[in-house]
Amino acid sequence: MAQVQYYGTGRRKSSVARVRLVPGEGRVIINGRDFENYIPFAALREVVKQPLVATETLGNYNVLVNVNGGGYTGQAGAIRHGISRALLKADPEYRLTLKRAGLLTRDARMKERKKYGLKGARRAPQFSKR
């Protein structure tokens, strides 16, 4: 018998996460590794768990994630977005809960580009009066 799976794609900064929710005991596997080993910071691990905690489904699904691009923060945000979208497909009644928690909104903030004549995006070279 084919197992029920729910898919969701999440994005944040330059990271893209393809998330698969499978009914199970609550394990989170990111790129073939356990998420405690993949994400070194406890705060970012909490970010990844936010949608499951908000919908009270923490032990109900195994989360299988393929994520690439960006750093730890971007990847954690992308995974959170992907899990939220997959949960929405699993049960549309979660929409209000996830929306109120702000978990369905794609965080549009990106790194600002460096401009010519400047040291960074906005940092100007040191000014010398004489």
Curated annotation (Swiss-Prot):
GO terms under biological process: translation
Residue ranges of the TM segments: none
InterPro entries: Ribosomal_Su5_D2-typ_SF, Ribosomal_uS9, Ribosomal_uS9_bac/plastid, Ribosomal_uS9_CS, Ribsml_uS5_D2-typ_fold_subgr
Gene3D superfamilies: 3.30.230.10
Keywords assigned: Ribonucleoprotein, Ribosomal protein
A molecular-function term among this protein's GO annotations: structural constituent of ribosome
SUPFAM superfamilies tied to this protein: Ribosomal protein S5 domain 2-like
GO cellular component terms given for this protein: cytosolic small ribosomal subunit
Pfam families from the UniProt entry: Ribosomal_S9 (PF00380)
PANTHER family cross-referenced by the UniProt entry: RIBOSOMAL PROTEIN S9, SMALL RIBOSOMAL SUBUNIT PROTEIN US9M
Family label: Belongs to the universal ribosomal protein uS9 family.
NCBIfam families: PRK00132.1
UniProt protein name: Small ribosomal subunit protein uS9
